[in-house]
């Protein structure tokens, strides 16, 4: 299908988003064209503002507009427990269940040799620095229950074994191959309750 160049550019831009193929991108592009100009400008401004004004917490790696993030800055949280997750969206999913009151560490990915991603390519070195603090008693590995998530959890657990820090893995009330962000609060809560030592 041949579209005018501005529509083609818009479709190509939408296709850069995960899970958006050519048909969905075209549908979104035509939806945007039907929007009021003020709404389109607000949408574009929201995209630019998010990109410019958000960064990663220097402590945990969670996405934030303040450094440290609101979780790391909260003095009422249990600083003896760190929950290790893959992405910021996993922190948001965990926070929805309101059962976990410790801190987080965001890896920004998983070990994936097939994709050329090793331990040094994700946020593991910063985790090791954080664990030099004598107040850390437990690390909960809450990576996704897929091949890469399991490999990353196993790597971290082996790395931490000599430290004497208790290392646990969330239970698999989550489907194998699933993502934390799609789990409901009850399932996540049960997975945290049923975590096991690794």
From Swiss-Prot:
Zinc finger (C4-type): 57-72
GO MF, one example: zinc ion binding
Domain of life: Bacteria
Gene3D superfamilies, per the entry: 3.30.60.80, 3.40.1360.10, 6.10.250.240, RecR Domain 1 (1.10.8.420)
A Pfam short name: RecR_C
GO biological process, one term: double-strand break repair
InterPro entries: DNA_Rcmb_RecR, Rcmb_RecR, Rcmb_RecR_Znf, TOPRIM_dom, TOPRIM_RecR
Domain (Toprim): residue spans on this chain: 80-175
Statement: the UniProt record of this protein carries the keyword Zinc-finger: yes
UniProt keyword terms in alphabetical order: DNA damage, DNA recombination, DNA repair, Metal-binding, Zinc, Zinc-finger
Protein family: Belongs to the RecR family.
PANTHER family: RECOMBINATION PROTEIN RECR
Function: May play a role in DNA repair. It seems to be involved in an RecBC-independent recombinational process of DNA repair. It may act with RecF and RecO.
Name of the protein described by the UniProt record: Recombination protein RecR
Species assigned in the record: Listeria monocytogenes serovar 1/2a (strain ATCC BAA-679 / EGD-e)
């Amino acid at each position: 299908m041949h579209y005018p160049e501005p529509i083609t550019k818009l479709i190509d831009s939408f296709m850069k988003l995960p899970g958006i193929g050519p048909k969905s991108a075209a549908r979104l592009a035509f939806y945007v064209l039907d929007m009021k100009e003020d709404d389109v400008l607000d949408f574009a401004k929201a995209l630019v503002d998010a990109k410019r004004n958000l960064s990663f917490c220097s402590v945990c790696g969670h996405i934030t507009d303040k450094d440290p993030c609101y979780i790391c800055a909260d003095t009422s949280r249990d600083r003896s427990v760190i929950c290790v997750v893959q992405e910021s969206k996993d922190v948001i999913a965990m926070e929805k269940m309101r059962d976990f009151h410790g801190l987080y560490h965001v890896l920004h990915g998983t070990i994936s040799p097939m994709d050329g991603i090793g331990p040094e390519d994700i946020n593991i070195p910063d985790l090791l620095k954080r664990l030099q603090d004598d107040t850390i008693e437990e690390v909960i590995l809450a990576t996704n229950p897929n091949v890469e998530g399991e490999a990353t959890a196993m790597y971290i657990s082996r790395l931490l074994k000599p430290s004497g820090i208790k290392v646990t893995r969330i239970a698999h009330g989550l489907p194998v191959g699933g993502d934390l962000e799609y789990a409901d609060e009850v399932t996540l809560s049960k997975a945290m309750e049923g975590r096991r030592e690794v």
